[in-house]
Curated annotation (Swiss-Prot):
Gene3D superfamilies cross-referenced by the UniProt entry: Glutamine synthetase, N-terminal domain, Glutamine synthetase/guanido kinase, catalytic domain
Major location (coarse): cytoplasm
Name of protein: Glutamine synthetase
Cofactors, names only: Mg(2+)
An example Gene Ontology molecular-function term: metal ion binding
SMART domains: Gln-synt_C (SM01230)
Lineage: Archaea, Methanobacteriati, Methanobacteriota, Thermococci, Thermococcales
């Protein structure tokens, strides 16, 4: 968007603009400026202190600059404010640990190979009543695809969907999920950077609308023990010269198969990025439709990578382990880098399955070469430290990310020891609720 055009878009009611970026956890951060300073924010940028932003700079060298991306300008329909995403700079150069900048660089690498990535997410969330405690209360007892009286939140879902186009999101399917008070609103796929922005916007819209109704919306992977977890399946395709290169004559193309091979090869390390919280691994357990075993198959929802039954230009893969606690910019960069590694090195996919992996014997899984995803954040971080490709995907953010996450894991272990709880507990602790409920 031309800067002058963006300035002309102002509604007379818009007095302030929110400059939005995310921290290492994917949590939105930012500041507001008078609307009259938007052009300055685009051309020169607005300086800020990065030392208090998780995963950014130390206090001894904390000066950063936010430059607005005018193509992301939107006006919030329930408030007299606009929002804009952007990129972060340090010393007049792109800041190496900026999550949005990291994804941009990963996409530039993909484009050098001639590819453009499109991603469609399926973020799930729970709605809870506000009661001032961590005794979470559910406002409805609906189940999967319920549309009658059990689904008390259908009007809230509709309201969220009605606001989405104002932020550039196109809602496609709204429905109650498997868990009581659990919901999903799918929106149309887009280019990877736009989709990452859209995930941040979708969380913002959902939480704001829930707040209007006196409820909390949480994207925490596993807010309730014994209930289904919140996932964020990613539907991914690569395009070249306007054509979907995942499309083969009979099923997927060789490029798509190698892309799958790359993700399977790096799957263990990827979980540290796509499932980056202690709580993530309480969702990744058998029997809740969350993938645990590193495998792939056509139409098979027990596999880590599923190929949906759509061909032609709709050819794509579905990566099923990510959850909404992931920083979408990091997650997309890492997954695409892993897939590109598969294409470059012609990595054939392994562990193909047609049957339910959960019901297989351990011997059968071993025979098919099916391995298991890490069972905890600590295990995932160990795998990340050994994986050059995924580490490189995080760029200059890797050091901050790995240090931050190890401290997170150690803090959790200290909590368990203090509470005399086993290290492998699958119960959801108050430590997790306090840390992840508002992600």
């Amino acid at each position: 968007m031309n800067i002058s055009v963006s300035m002309n878009k102002f509604d007379s009611k818009i007095k302030f603009v929110q400059l939005v970026f995310v921290d290492i956890n994917g949590m939105p951060k930012g500041m507001e400026i008078p609307a009259s300073r938007l052009e300055e924010a685009v051309t020169d940028g607005i300086s800020f202190d990065g030392s208090s932003v998780p995963g950014f700079q130390g206090i001894e060298d904390s000066d950063l600059v936010f430059k607005a991306d005018p193509d992301t300008y939107v006006e919030v329909p329930w408030d007299n404010v606009a929002r804009v995403y952007g990129f972060i700079y340090k010393d007049n150069k792109p800041y190496g640990a900026d999550p949005r900048g990291i994804l941009k660089r990963a996409l530039e690498e993909l484009e050098k190979e001639g590819y453009k990535a499109y991603i469609g997410p399926e973020p799930e969330f729970y709605l809870f009543k506000k009661n001032g405690t961590w005794e979470l209360e559910i406002p409805d007892v609906g189940g999967y695809f319920d549309i009658l009286t059990l689904d008390k939140a259908r009007d809230i879902r509709r309201e969220i969907a009605e606001y989405m186009p104002s932020f550039g999101l196109i809602p496609e399917v709204l429905h109650h999920e498997v868990g009581k008070a659990q919901h999903e609103i799918d929106f149309r796929y887009d280019e990877a950077l736009k989709t990452a922005d859209n995930i941040v916007s979708f969380k913002y819209i959902t939480k704001a609308v829930a707040e209007m109704h006196g409820l909390y919306a949480t994207f925490m992977p596993k807010p309730l023990f014994g209930f289904p977890g919140n996932g964020m399946h990613l539907h991914i395709s690569l395009w070249k010269d306007g054509e979907n290169v995942f499309m083969g004559e009979e099923g997927l193309s060789e490029i798509a198969l190698h892309f799958i091979g790359g993700i399977l090869k790096h799957a263990k390390a990827l979980t540290a990025v796509t499932n980056p919280t202690v709580n993530s691994y309480k969702r990744l357990v058998p029997s809740y439709e969350a993938p645990v075993y590193i495998s792939w198959g056509y139409r098979n929802r027990s596999a880590l990578i599923r190929v949906p039954a759509f061909w032609g230009k709709g050819a794509r893969i579905e990566y099923r382990c990510p959850d909404p606690s992931a920083n979408p910019y990091f997650a997309f960069a890492a997954v695409l880098k892993a897939g590109l590694d598969g294409i470059k090195h012609k990595i054939d996919p392994f562990a193909y399955v047609e049957e339910n992996v959960y019901e297989m014997s351990e011997e059968k899984r071993k025979e098919l070469g099916i391995e298991t995803l890490p069972g905890s954040l600590g295990e995932a971080l160990e795998e990340l430290e050994k994986d050059k490709v995924v580490k490189e995907a995080l760029g200059d953010a890797y050091k901050n990310f790995i240090n931050y996450k190890w401290k997170e894991w150690e803090s959790y272990l200290e909590y368990l020891e203090e509470k005399h709880m086993p290290k492998d507990t699958k119960k959801v602790t108050e430590w997790e609720l306090e840390r992840y409920f508002f992600l």
